């Protein structure tokens, strides 16, 4: 990951900190910063980091390695959105009808690409474990009524919402589990309630 030579070193370092941290989920080491901005001296990088800290752009804990916090990103993470947790799904009723909403779940806004028409379903069972979707997970769903082959969707089958991989073929719809112990569900038609855009799991 190399920063273009189009700004002064301090700006290059700051931009690299943001880019690296967003990509990896943790800040870079001083040596990684040196390599990215073509500096040989770690002391020079430390000097730039100190000046960025004085400007209030970053915060460093000198007692811990890589303990560098980018204020801009920290503020983004503190912005929360409320996503409704949907319980029982009933045919003919809007998915986000008040009667369907069990609770609200707060999530940092930077964890999702947008907050338009999102809802959460609690995952029950192990039919999607090979896609990394486990029993008890919170599935974050973008409300949509259409799907393309290969999408992981929430479909309504006989008044029950199910999370499966969607395929339309030979005039039928195949809802494919991601677990070799389960058979696919083959139907002529079904209601698509939304598309999976994320998973939240508490440890």
From Swiss-Prot:
The gene is lexA. Keywords: Autocatalytic cleavage, DNA damage, DNA repair, DNA replication, DNA-binding, Hydrolase, Repressor, SOS response, Transcription, Transcription regulation. This is LexA repressor. Signal peptide: none annotated. Its EC number is 3.4.21.88. It is an enzyme of class 3 (hydrolase). Homodimer. CDD domains: HTH_ARSR, S24_LexA-like. It comes from Clostridium perfringens (strain 13 / Type A). One of its GO terms (molecular function) is serine-type endopeptidase activity. Disulfide bonds: none annotated. Represses a number of genes involved in the response to DNA damage (SOS response), including recA and lexA. In the presence of single-stranded DNA, RecA interacts with LexA causing an autocatalytic cleavage which disrupts the DNA-binding part of LexA, leading to derepression of the SOS regulon and eventually DNA repair. It catalyses: Hydrolysis of Ala-|-Gly bond in repressor LexA.
